[in-house]
């Protein structure tokens, strides 16, 4: 980790949480999760607090490791991680038929990496919906630097209660974000409401697959690790997600777990048995260096108390993701394209 990289990471740790409150925020966040004895009901009923704490605590680590787009991707042999991430975003825009001048909504947009890429790729106007103040502040600055403030903006709101009029958007997408929703039907109904009739919604969902066995202790541990390290109330099955879209009123055009035929495993950047210079910060060695540096920064007071514990639960998530991917019980890219009927 370079000195500038270390300082950039340290300066953002904790997001909008004050430096003195980071440790207690970590305590509260961890207690929500099954890995520490927390209950699914508490995670769902307190999802706004849980998810906001998660992204305040984790965003700087994400940006340091992933760049501006916090998601996995279907990947071809010979393709870099960055190239695959961009193509994964372009695929959504193409499936939605996004064209110049269209109004598009990115649900759960993070710091806006995908919305900036899709806006530049399609020449559409993209609004990012996010309920985390720190991520929106960071995203607006990145929009300014990229010169896209005229076509890309952010709205701070809960995707379960969107502040938009009915039939506002020409297209809506979500990239590994609606997995945070406590109720998928309620979330998809809001998306349905703000989408214009005859237009489409495309999504990459985090899901457990048909290979997941709920009574298998190893499978349950992996699921708990992923939920802990990624701020999730519960990981739903692919069937549950697709049925939720139908229950919200959508017509299904097509669906597929894109991880099934990805020539390069989606979890490769996190796999301790592999090494890649192109994604070094995500590798086991890279993460170990980051963890050591965060510990040192915390020790000398440049990073808030509790930062090392955030690094630790993100490391636990990485282990769960790799194991879940190898056992084929988890996918971060269950894709479906659905349409709002022209006449309801």
Curated annotation (Swiss-Prot):
Record carries keyword Lipid metabolism: yes
Gene Ontology cellular component list: endoplasmic reticulum
Q: Which GO terms describe its molecular function?
A: sterol 24-C-methyltransferase activity
Catalytic reaction list: zymosterol + S-adenosyl-L-methionine = fecosterol + S-adenosyl-L-homocysteine + H(+)
Recorded E.C. number(s)?
Answer: 2.1.1.41
Write out the pathway annotation from the protein's UniProt entry.
Steroid biosynthesis; sterol biosynthesis
Identify the keywords attached in UniProt to this record, alphabetized. Lipid biosynthesis, Lipid metabolism, Methyltransferase, S-adenosyl-L-methionine, Steroid biosynthesis, Steroid metabolism, Sterol biosynthesis, Sterol metabolism, Transferase
Please, one GO biological process term? Answer: sterol biosynthetic process
Q: Does the keyword Lipid biosynthesis apply?
A: yes
Any matching Pfam family: Sterol_MT_C
- In which family does this protein belong, per the annotation? Belongs to the class I-like SAM-binding methyltransferase superfamily. Erg6/SMT family.
Q: What is this protein called?
A: Cycloartenol-C-24-methyltransferase 1
- Say which species the protein is native to: Oryza sativa subsp. japonica
